[in-house]
C-alpha cells in the first residue's frame, strides 16, 4: 500500500502487544545484526577468506526476509529503490575496474563481496519500513554501556601496563593503550560512539535520562580511544545539527530547548572529560613488575611521551597525519592516465605497496576519498557522490538536520579512517531513510512544510498501514 507524501506511520513496539512469530524472529535478527556491528574485530576463515560476524548476521537476516512470504515481496520492491540501485551501480563499476586492472582477483572479490552484503543489509532494513526503528533503538541502547566499558578497559590497561589489556591496542608512538573494545581499531570504536550519539541527540530530549547517561559516558569513551578526529567530529556534527535546526526554525518555529538539550549536554560532557584527561596521572608510566623469566624490565626512554599527550598533539607534519600523507603520496603514483578515470581495481593498493615504515606489511590507504579514487577512479567517485545525493533526496524532511550532521561527520572521519564497509554505516543509513513516525514531533507550520517538501519514500510501499 502506498502512502502519500509525509505519511506518518507508527513504529511498532514488539512488546506493547502480542505479535506474530514472524515479527519476533525479524526483531531478534535485527538485534543480531546490530549486536554484530559492534563486534568488528571478530572473524573466522572460510576457504581462504576472512569472514566477520558482522557479515554473517546480515546474511542470516536477509535470508530470513527471502524465505518468509510476508517479507519477501517488500524486499523485492526495495531492491528497486533508487538508493539501492545507485549503490548497486557503484559495486558494479568496482567489479569492472577490478576485472580490468586487479593483479589478484581474490583480494578484490573479498571487498566486493563485503560491499554486496552491505547492499543487502541496507535493502533488508529499508524493506522493514517503520520497523527499521528497531535497529535504531537497539544501537542507541548499546552505546552507553559500550562507552563505559571502553573507558574502564582504558584505565585498567594503562594502570597495569598492559597486564590486563583486553579490548585495547598499544600505541607505541605515544606510549599509551587505546581502547577499541570489540571494534577493529580505536578509530572505528570512537566513530561508532559518535554516530549513535548523534542519532540519540536527534530524538530531541524524548529520553532525557538516557541522553544524560550518554553525555557522561560517550565523552569518556572518546577519551579512552585517544582519537582526536572523533572528538572533533562529535563537536562538528553537533554544530551542524544545531545550525541546521536554527536555520529551519526561522520558517518553522519549534521550542529551542527541544533540539539544544542533547547537544549542550554532550558538549559539556566532552569538555569535562577532555579537561579531566589533562589532569589524570601519567597512566602510561605504570608497568607490571618483571617476572622471574624476564632478564630485564622495560625501560622508558627519554623520548617517550606521557599518555595524555596524544589528544593534544596536533601535528600535521608527523605522527598520524604525516603517516597518512605518506600513504596518499604513494597512492598518487598509481592514479595517473587511464587509472585516474577508471581506477586500479578494488582493494589493490596493498598488492602494489608496503605500509610506509613497515617493511613486509601490505599497505592500506585508510582514507576513504583516496581509497575510492585509487580503486574506482573518477568514475567510481562520481557514482558514489550520486549515491549520496540520492540518499539525501529520500531522507524524510524532519530528519534532514541529523542526516546533514552524520554526513559531515562521516566525511570528516573518512579522511583519516575508512569505515565505509562496516555494517554500522548501513544500519545508520537505513535509520535515516526509514519513514517518519508519529513520535517525531513537529509543529503545525512544520507539518505543512513537510507536505510540500518531503519526497515520498519507497520505504512507505512496504505494506505499512495508514493511520
Model-identified regions with their sequence ranges:
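N-terminal signal-anchor transmembrane segment
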Residues: 2-70, 92-100
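Hydrophobic transmembrane alpha-helices and their immediate junctions
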Residues: 8, 13, 374-410
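Membrane-interfacial loop-to-transmembrane alpha-helix junctions, especially the N-terminal start
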Residues: 20-30, 74-89, 135-142, 210-211, ...
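Transmembrane alpha-helices of multi-pass inner-membrane enzymes
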Residues: 62, 198-200, 404-414, 418-460, ...
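Aromatic-anchored transmembrane helix interface
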Residues: 83-92, 104-127, 143, 147-148
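Alpha-helical transmembrane segments of multi-pass inner-membrane proteins
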Residues: 136-165, 181-248
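A membrane-periplasm/extracellular boundary helix in multi-pass inner-membrane enzymes
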Residues: 157-158, 248-313, 333, 466
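Long extracytoplasmic/lumenal interhelical loops at the membrane interface
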Residues: 314-376
Amino acid at each position: 500500500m502506498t502512502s502519500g507524501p509525509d505519511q506518518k506511520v507508527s513504529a511498532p513496539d514488539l512488546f506493547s502487544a502480542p505479535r506474530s512469530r514472524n515479527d519476533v524472529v525479524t526483531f531478534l535478527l535485527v538485534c543480531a545484526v546490530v549486536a554484530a556491528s559492534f563486534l568488528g574485530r571478530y572473524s573466522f576463515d572460510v576457504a581462504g577468506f576472512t569472514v566477520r560476524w558482522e557479515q554473517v548476521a546480515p546474511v542470516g537476516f536477509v535470508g530470513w526476509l527471502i524465505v518468509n512470504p510476508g517479507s519477501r515481496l517488500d524486499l523485492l520492491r526495495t531492491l528497486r529503490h533508487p538508493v539501492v540501485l545507485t549503490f548497486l551501480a557503484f559495486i558494479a563499476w568496482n567489479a569492472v575496474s577490478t576485472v580490468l586492472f586487479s593483479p589478484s582477483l581474490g583480494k578484490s572479490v573479498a571487498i566486493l563481496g563485503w560491499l554486496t552484503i552491505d547492499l543487502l543489509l541496507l535493502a533488508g532494513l529499508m524493506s522493514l519500513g517503520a520497523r527499521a526503528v528497531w535497529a535504531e533503538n537497539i544501537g542507541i541502547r548499546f552505546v552507553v554501556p559500550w562507552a563505559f566499558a571502553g573507558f574502564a578497559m582504558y584505565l585498567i590497561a594503562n594502570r597495569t601496563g598492559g597486564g590486563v589489556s583486553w579490548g585495547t591496542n598499544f600505541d607505541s608512538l605515544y606510549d599509551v593503550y587505546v581502547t577499541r573494545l570489540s571494534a577493529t581499531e580505536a578509530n572505528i570504536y570512537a566513530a561508532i560512539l559518535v554516530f549513535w550519539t548523534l542519532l540519540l541527540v536527534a530524538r530531541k530530549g524524548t529520553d532525557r535520562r538516557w541522553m544524560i547517561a550518554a553525555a557522561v559516558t560517550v565523552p569518556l569513551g572518546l577519551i579512552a580511544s585517544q582519537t582526536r578526529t572523533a572528538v572533533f567530529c562529535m563537536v562538528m556534527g553537533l554544530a551542524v545539527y544545531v545550525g541546521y535546526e536554527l536555520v529551519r526554525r526561522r520558517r518553522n518555529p519549534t521550542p529551542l530547548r527541544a533540539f539544544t538539550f542533547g547537544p549542550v549536554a554532550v558538549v559539556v560532557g566532552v569538555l569535562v572529560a577532555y579537561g579531566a584527561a589533562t589532569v589524570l596521572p601519567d597512566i602510561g608510566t605504570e608497568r607490571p613488575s618483571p617476572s622471574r623469566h624476564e632478564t630485564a624490565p622495560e625501560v622508558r626512554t627519554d623520548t617517550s611521551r606521557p599518555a595524555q599527550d596524544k589528544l593534544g598533539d596536533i601535528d600535521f607534519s608527523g605522527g598520524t597525519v604525516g603517516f597518512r600523507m605518506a600513504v596518499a603520496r604513494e597512492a598518487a603514483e598509481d592514479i595517473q592516465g587511464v587509472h585516474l578515470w577508471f581506477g586500479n581495481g578494488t582493494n589493490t593498493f596493498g598488492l602494489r605497496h608496503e605500509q610506509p615504515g613497515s617493511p613486509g606489511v601490505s599497505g592500506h590507504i585508510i582514507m576513504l576519498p583516496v581509497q575510492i579514487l585509487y580503486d574506482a577512479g573518477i568514475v567510481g567517485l562520481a557514482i558514489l557522490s550520486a549515491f549520496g545525493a540520492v540518499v539525501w533526496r529520500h531522507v524524510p524532511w524532519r530528519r534532514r538536520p541529523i542526516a546533514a550532521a552524520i554526513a559531515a561527520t562521516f566525511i570528516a572521519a573518512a579522511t583519516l579512517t575508512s569505515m565505509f564497509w562496516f555494517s554500522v554505516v548501513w544500519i545508520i543509513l537505513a535509520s535515516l531513510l526509514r519513514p517518519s513516525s508519529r513520535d517525531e514531533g513537529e509543529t503545525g507550520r512544520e507539518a505543512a512544510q513537510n507536505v510540500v517538501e518531503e519526497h515520498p519514500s519507497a520505504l512507505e510501499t512496504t505494506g505499512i498501514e495508514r493511520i
